[in-house]
Amino acid sequence: MMFRQSMLTLSLFAAFYANAESSDTVFQPASYTPSQMDFGGVGLIKMPTGRMAPEGEFNLSANINHEYRMYNASIALFPWFEATIRYAIVPNKRMGAQEFSGDSPYLDKGIDFKFRLLEESRWLPEVAVGVRDFGGTGLFDGEFIAASKKLYTNDYGVFDFTLGMGWGYMGMHGNVTNPFCKANDKFCERPKDFGGTGGEVDYHRWFKGPAAIYGGVEYQTPYQPLRLKVEYDTNDYSEDFPTRFRPGDFYEVDMTQHTPINVGLIYRAHRNIDLRLSYERGDTVSAGFSLRTNYNELASQWRDEPTPRPSNEQPENINEVDWQSLEKQLALVAGYEGVKIHVDDTTVIISGEQVKYRDSEIAHERAAAVLRNQLPKSINTYKVINTQQHIATEAADIDAKEYERVANVSYIKPHISDASSVSKDTKVRGQQVHDGSERLYYGVSPTLRQSIAEPEEFYIFNLGVRGEASYWLTNQLQASSSIQVNIYDNYPELNFIVPPDGTTVPPRVRSLGRMYFHDNPVRMDTLQLTWFDNFGDSIYQQTYAGYLESMFAGVGTEWLYRPRGKNWAIGADINLVAQRDPDSWFGVYQQETQYSAADGRSFKVLDKGYTGFVSGYYMPKWSWLDDTLFKIDVGQYLAQDVGVRGDFSKQFKSGVIVGAYASLSNLSSEEFGEGSFTKGFYISIPFDVMTVKPSRNRAKFDWQPLTRDGGQKLNKEHDLFSLTDSASPWFTRKNTVPQP
């Protein structure tokens, strides 16, 4: 019997570590790195610059003044591309009707993009173009083109000058004729309308209407922690949302711009922490901070078992091998668990699940070191097979004689690749001499279910404990189950059970979360049978039936074609599902129309329906899109709407993955509700950059701006693309950041 304590507590802030700067370095010759602005992203105070943050830099920032509280997350995905997600709270405005959102202040969500057009050279500035409040509600929407140029001095620090042109929110001064207006009259006026119910891309407004020239300078003083900023702000604030008084507002706000000159300072309190203070519009003080790290700089620092040194005490023949000891050493030293061992003439084959090392070469070298010491010299080949859910996904053949030369450093710079080769043959042959696999697995882990920026509460969460167990009935058939126990949540802050969001067309496949996650403090999340299979070395399949997730039961199958070593794969799944009754562990809804007595209204659920997709995966090898993954799903969602989901992710040197997805379907914006379509973002962080032990596990933070019912997928327990990752690694790519 095997017990593992699962480690699933999510932590983004574990990455924010560094040594504090010592006092003897702060007066070294000044060096300049771009800093964040109030809106998030690289900029001056309110106005963006042509600068980009270093590739891989992630910033969490906040800025507070009388009119706004802004919370931002920015990421430099590429040297030429930066994205920012922003929450803006407007304290003087009520979110909505009091019976719906109580006294919660107005909350706006926005996304910004910036693209570098020209990299700075000796004579030319760095030039960037960007869009603010992309797909938002239009509170801050605007566009800009900016150029920045640095001036270094020997004794007085670094000056970074910026000159730009803004439209929309950044062009309210209208101090220059819109150059696009001269080319086409449609650019002379900026449309007042915004698409749908928010969330749509209002590209028909871009670069239209009044334009304004802005500028400023950021000054890195000789005292390294201190930098100063001054800018000419071209928003006159006459149309800012807090100034638009309406019945129900908490109080009135005057945002008259007494001067367009804003000044500010930044103090670097720590290598990864900036404190900001600014004086804006001639009468407003703003304060903020930013926390940052760089995902291209997070090295793995382990305390690991030492690799065994070559020993002369090898057994004389195969009959003298202690297979039990060999299994334990393969798990402890090389990370292969549940090992089965076969002997085929002069080849020893081990197959097991790799749980420690993302770098397969480290796993192979450590396995070879163990096998070399515990097998007789008559063995010529070590075959190492990595399995996931008993599916073979990767194999390597290690020449025992060549490895002997590597282990004894018989030549300059020996490497495990000198003795090993990737094998397409993952079949097990010969006589089985040991079976270390465990049929029963069980574990307990903490869980955190959270939602940020809902209309009735900024942060809604559910903290609990999840117990899970699985049992292999055969080598291919697994029974599994999980039970969730709530410890604490703040769902009672919700003022409804069925959200009064105005939607009636799609069934409530995801927006009934409170009924499942709060009203049932102890619940069965999953109970299912799963059959795993593979055909040849490229085709994988799973079939499953039961209670598939917390909200749906059903039966389904998934197929995946994934050639080993290739940068693409094709898959498909089809599922017949029914929505589970939240008031019963084993029941499902029998009728489409239901009634909520607490809310006094009817609503629709999915009593029976199909969902499934054809999926394509592609990892391009283009230099300007290196280390990225595109995934496209085409099919039918849970709400029976039909459409396509696109998912794009970028992996940094440390293995941290940042991605975004969007689901488009045949639901109109009005049928979908606020947000217009489902969209989300996620960060996946390898445990081995946050802990001192090697691990292939990951912590994932997934965020959807709004949870609506359209464009939602089934949350299957197993995903074949993840299970077969070793066939062409994505999630288990090695950390390439040099050790400190």
PLM-predicted stretches and their roles:
Residues 22-23, 184, 193, 197-201, ...:
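Flexible, glycine-rich linker and terminal segments associated
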Residues 60, 71-75, 85, 111-115, ...:
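Residues on the lipid-exposed face of transmembrane beta-strands in outer-membrane beta-barrel proteins
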Residues 1-20, 648:
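Gram-negative bacterial Sec-dependent N-terminal signal peptides
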Residues 88-112, 116, 130-142, 150, ...:
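Outer-membrane beta-barrel translocator/channel fold
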Residues 61-63, 74, 84-88, 128-132, ...:
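Transmembrane beta-strands of outer-membrane beta-barrel proteins
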Residues 58-59, 79-85, 92, 120-127, ...:
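Repeated loop/turn-to-beta-strand initiation elements of outer-membrane beta-barrel proteins
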Residues 58-60, 346-354:
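Short, aliphatic-rich beta-strand segments
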Residues 21-139, 151-155, 221-226, 231, ...:
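Transmembrane beta-barrel domains of Gram-negative outer membranes and organellar outer membranes
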